C-alpha cells in the first residue's frame, strides 16, 4: 500500500504531494480526511473543492483490489459531517462476479460503518454504472446527492438516474445510512459474535427482512464490521461480508490476515448469507473458521 501511495504522490501536483504526504503516509491513516484536514489542503494547494477531490482520486484508487480486471477505480464520498472517505473496487478470484464491490459502494459503506448518516457528494474516476446509480438511490440523501467526475460539471444523482425506481415504489420509507438500531442482542459470550450483532443492528434489509452483520478478526487483533445494505432493485444489494472486507482493506490490512469470522442474521429473513459468506471466505482462505448465529 505504501508503494502505491508513493507512486500517486509522485504523480500529484507538487503543492498537493508536499502537504498530503505526512497525512497519507502516517501509520494511523484510515482512508479518510477530516473536515479540518481537507480545508487545510484547500488553502495549501490553492485548488477549488472539486479540483482537490478529483486530485485525491488516485489515492483512493490505491486501495483497489482487482486481480481479475486489473481496472483500478477510486471513489471519495463526503459525509454530512464534512469528512471525506475513500473507497475502491474489490474483486475476488475463484468466486462468481456477483461478489464484486464497486468503488462507489466501497466508499459509501466506508462512511456508513464510520457513523455517517448521509452523504452530500461523491467523486469518482469514471461515470457510475447503472448498478451503482441504483445502489446510491437507496441512500437517505439520494435526492440531494451530487456526483463529480474529472473534467465534468457536477451533477445530481437523479440527473444520471431519471425516472428512478427506488424504495418508495415498494412502499418503503427507511433508507440506507439512516440512523437505526434494531435492538438485537445475544447471550453468546463470544466477543466476535457480539460485534457481529452490533453490525446487524445497523443493517438495512426492508425487502427480505434478513437483518444481518459480519465481524472479521485479523491476526493484529483488530475487528472489522459489515452490515447488510439491501437495495430496492435487489441485485445491487451489498452483503455484510463484503462491507466488512471493505473496512479491512481500507485499514491497510490484507485478506490473508483474517483469523476468524462471525455471521449473525435474523431467523425471519427470506434469504440467508451463510452459504455465500462461507464460499467467499473459503476462496480467500479455506482455513478461516466461520461462527454462525440466527436470532
Curated annotation (Swiss-Prot):
One of its GO terms (biological process) is cytidine deamination. Transmembrane segments: none annotated. The active site is at 104 (proton donor). Keywords: Hydrolase, Metal-binding, Zinc. InterPro entries: APOBEC/CMP_deaminase_Zn-bd (IPR016192), CMP_dCMP_dom (IPR002125), Cyd/dCyd_deaminase_Zn-bd (IPR013171), Cyt/Deoxycyt_deaminase (IPR050202), Cyt_deam_dimer (IPR006263), Cytidine_deaminase-like (IPR016193), Cytidine_deaminase_bacteria (IPR020797). The keyword Metal-binding applies. This is Cytidine deaminase. It comes from Vibrio vulnificus (strain CMCP6). The gene is cdd.
